[in-house]
C-alpha cells in the first residue's frame, strides 16, 4: 500500500511539472531581441512587419517629393539660359545700333560727298537701323522671319499688278533727289523691257512721248508766267500812281482826290 501511494504521488508531481512547462511556453509567440527586450517594445509577432511596410510608404512619398522639387529647378535653369541668350543678342544689337547712329551723326570727313550722296548714305544707314530694330524685335518675341511688302507679293491679276506697281513706285521714288536717279531709271526701263514684244514696246514709247509733251507744255506755261510778271498792262501806270498817292492822302481824299480831278 505504501508503495502504491508513493507511485501515485510521483505521477501527480510529474503532471505538475508538465503543466508548469506548458505555462512557460506561452512566452514563445513574443519575439526576443538583443538586449533582453521584445521587438518593437512588447509587440506580438507580425506587428513589426506592418510598421516596416508603413515606413517604406513614407520613403516613397519622400522620394516623389524630391523629384517634384528637382523638376522646377531644371525649368528655371532653362529659362535662365534663354534669358541670357536674349540679353546677349540685345547687347550685340545695341552695339550695332550705336555704330549706325554714330555714322549718321558723324559722316566720314576723309571722303567728300555731294549733297545727293550724303542723302543716299543717310537713307541707307537709316534702312540698316530699321532692319536692325526689326530683327531685334523678332528675336526678342520669337517671331518667324515672315516676309512683308513687295517681297511678299506674287501678283497674278490686274489689281495685284496695280498694287505691286504702287509699292514699287513708292520704293523707287524715295531716291528721286539723287544725282544718279535719271540714269538709274534709264537703265532700269531698258532692262525690264528687253523681253517685251514690239507692240508692247510701242505702247510704252507712246506713253512716254505723251508724258514728255505734257512736261514741255507745263514748262512753256511756267516760263510765260514769269515773263508776264515783269510787264505792266494798259492802265497800269495810272493805277500804280494812284496807289502811291493814296499812301499820302490822309484827309478825306487829299492828294488822291486832287489827282483824280486833274485827270
Swiss-Prot record:
Region (Disordered): 1-115
Taxonomic placement: Eukaryota, Metazoa, Chordata, Craniata, Vertebrata
Protein species of origin: Mus musculus (Mouse)
Composition bias, Low complexity: 1-13
Family the entry assigns: Belongs to the eIF-3 subunit J family.
Region called Promotes stable association with the 40S ribosome, residue ranges: 248-263
Modified residue annotations for N-acetylalanine: 2
Compositionally biased spans, kind Acidic residues: 45-66
InterPro entries cross-referenced by the UniProt entry: eIF3-like_dom_sf, eIF3j
Pfam families: eIF3_subunit
One of the GO biological process terms: formation of cytoplasmic translation initiation complex
Chain residue ranges for the region called Sufficient for interaction with EIF3B: 6-74
Name of the protein in question: Eukaryotic translation initiation factor 3 subunit J-B
Coiled-coil boundaries: 75-140
Modified residues (Phosphothreonine): 114
Modification type Phosphotyrosine: residues: 259
Gene Ontology cellular-component annotations: eukaryotic 43S preinitiation complex; eukaryotic 48S preinitiation complex; eukaryotic translation initiation factor 3 complex
Post-translational modification, as annotated: Phosphorylated. Phosphorylation is enhanced upon serum stimulation.
GO molecular function, a single term: translation initiation factor activity
Cell compartment(s), UniProt: Cytoplasm
Gene3D superfamilies hit by this protein: Eukaryotic translation initiation factor 3 like domains
Biased composition (Basic and acidic residues): 67-111
Keywords per UniProt: Acetylation, Coiled coil, Cytoplasm, Initiation factor, Isopeptide bond, Phosphoprotein, Protein biosynthesis, Ubl conjugation
Task of the protein: Component of the eukaryotic translation initiation factor 3 (eIF-3) complex, which is required for several steps in the initiation of protein synthesis. The eIF-3 complex associates with the 40S ribosome and facilitates the recruitment of eIF-1, eIF-1A, eIF-2:GTP:methionyl-tRNAi and eIF-5 to form the 43S pre-initiation complex (43S PIC). The eIF-3 complex stimulates mRNA recruitment to the 43S PIC and scanning of the mRNA for AUG recognition.
Amino acid at each position: 500500500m505504501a508503495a502504491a501511494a508513493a507511485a501515485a504521488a510521483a505521477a501527480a508531481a510529474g503532471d505538475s511539472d508538465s503543466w508548469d512547462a506548458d505555462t512557460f511556453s506561452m512566452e514563445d509567440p513574443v519575439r526576443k531581441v538583443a538586449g533582453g527586450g521584445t521587438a518593437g517594445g512588447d509587440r506580438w509577432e507580425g506587428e513589426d512587419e506592418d510598421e516596416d511596410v508603413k515606413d517604406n510608404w513614407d520613403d516613397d512619398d519622400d522620394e516623389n517629393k524630391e523629384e517634384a522639387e528637382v523638376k522646377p529647378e531644371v525649368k528655371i535653369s532653362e529659362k535662365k539660359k534663354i534669358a541670357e541668350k536674349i540679353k546677349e543678342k540685345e547687347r550685340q544689337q545695341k552695339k550695332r545700333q550705336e555704330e549706325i547712329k554714330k555714322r549718321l551723326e558723324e559722316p566720314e570727313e576723309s571722303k567728300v560727298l555731294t549733297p545727293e550722296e550724303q542723302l543716299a548714305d543717310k537713307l541707307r544707314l537709316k534702312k540698316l537701323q530699321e532692319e536692325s530694330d526689326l530683327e531685334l524685335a523678332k528675336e526678342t518675341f520669337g517671331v518667324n522671319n515672315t516676309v512683308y511688302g513687295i517681297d511678299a507679293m506674287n501678283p497674278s491679276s490686274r489689281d495685284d499688278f496695280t498694287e505691286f506697281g504702287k509699292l514699287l513706285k513708292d520704293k523707287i521714288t524715295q531716291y528721286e533727289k539723287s544725282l544718279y536717279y535719271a540714269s538709274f531709271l534709264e537703265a532700269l526701263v531698258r532692262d525690264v523691257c528687253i523681253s517685251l514684244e514690239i507692240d508692247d514696246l510701242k505702247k510704252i514709247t507712246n506713253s512716254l512721248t505723251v508724258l514728255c509733251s505734257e512736261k514741255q507744255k507745263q514748262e512753256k506755261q511756267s516760263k510765260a508766267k514769269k515773263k508776264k510778271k515783269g510787264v505792266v498792262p494798259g492802265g497800269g501806270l495810272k493805277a500804280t500812281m494812284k496807289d502811291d498817292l493814296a499812301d499820302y492822302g490822309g484827309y478825306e481824299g487829299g492828294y488822291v482826290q486832287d489827282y483824280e480831278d486833274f485827270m
